[in-house]
């Protein structure tokens, strides 16, 4: 077996990915307790929520208040998910210094999630990158359905690589490949990991797996064998996508 990395970095995405699909709404106080407990447990990167339209994702309607009231622990990176310039400005107003923009490699999923094609979504990110640079906000990127889509089926790696090129042109240095619908398998993860690291050695890579088919941990191991050391995780294994059938 190929030697594994000595160190990995975990981002807790529970406050966002874990809660966005839940029918039971937590109070602001309960969400703050979850975030602050994760920080006390030693998690160094926490995604506190998404700055998106509350009508589309009601569970995230209080993200601005969460950010404003959060007791921030030194040495912990608190980030938020955004889709557009309005979301970025909300994140800025809430004191968030790192925001993640996301686009789906699947056309159908991107239309459901953002009401845009992947090409339109990436094009719209140019003004976000310009604004973020002016305001000294760090942008990271995430590519949903990188390993397949429950709507479109197979998502060619070429589509993913094309989006990576576009994000890199915007100056983004950290990119996550997300298995939004849990369709990835270990061989695919390893091959993708080796390929993208060779193509883009200057990018900080993150992997985000769902456990829809019980392959989550096996895919993490495959990612580690490919040399990728950054992973998203979610407390209690919660999580899913409101716009992707069967994602969990």
Each predicted region: which residue ranges?
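Active-site beta->alpha loop and helix N-cap motifs at the rims of alpha/beta catalytic domains
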Residues: 50-53, 73-133, 137, 148-155
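Glycine-rich, positively charged N-terminal anion/phosphate-binding segment
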Residues: 28-76, 82-90, 95
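N-terminal small/glycine-rich loop or linker at the start of catalytic domains
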Residues: 1-23, 100-113, 134-151, 196-202
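Catalytic alpha/beta core domains of metabolic enzymes, predominantly
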Residues: 180-248
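Alpha-helix-loop-beta-strand connector modules within alpha/beta enzyme cores
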Residues: 56-80, 119-141, 162, 187-207
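Hydrophobic faces of well-ordered beta-strands that scaffold small-molecule active sites
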Residues: 9-17, 46-48, 77-81, 99-101, ...
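Glycine-rich, proline-tolerant flexible connector loops at the mouths of alpha/beta enzymes
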Residues: 44-69, 103-116, 145-151, 176-186, ...
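Active-site mouth loops of central-metabolism enzymes
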Residues: 11-30, 76-85, 112-118, 145-159, ...
């Amino acid at each position: 077996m190929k030697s594994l990395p000595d160190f990995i970095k975990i981002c807790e995405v529970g406050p966002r990915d874990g809660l966005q699909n839940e029918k039971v709404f937590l109070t602001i106080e309960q969400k703050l307790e979850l975030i602050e407990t994760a920080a006390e447990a030693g998690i160094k990167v926490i995604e506190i929520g998404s700055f998106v339209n509350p009508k589309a994702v009601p569970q995230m309607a209080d993200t601005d208040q969460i950010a404003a009231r959060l007791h921030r622990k030194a040495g912990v990176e608190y980030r938020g998910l955004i889709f557009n310039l309005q979301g970025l400005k909300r994140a800025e107003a809430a004191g968030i210094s790192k925001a993640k923009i996301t686009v789906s490699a699947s056309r159908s999923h991107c239309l459901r999630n953002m009401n845009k094609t992947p090409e339109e979504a990436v094009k719209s990110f140019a003004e976000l990158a310009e604004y973020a640079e002016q305001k000294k906000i760090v942008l990271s990127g995430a590519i949903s359905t990188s390993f397949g889509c429950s709507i479109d089926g197979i998502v060619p790696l070429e589509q993913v690589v094309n989006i990576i090129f576009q994000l890199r042109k915007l100056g983004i240095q950290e990119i996550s490949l997300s298995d939004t619908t849990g369709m990835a398998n270990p061989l695919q993860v390893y091959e993708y990991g080796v390929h993208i690291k060779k193509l883009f050695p200057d990018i900080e890579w993150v992997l985000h797996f769902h456990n829809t088919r019980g392959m989550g941990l096996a895919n993490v191991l495959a990612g580690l064998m490919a040399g990728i050391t950054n992973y998203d995780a979610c407390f209690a294994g919660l999580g899913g996508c409101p716009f992707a059938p069967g994602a969990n």
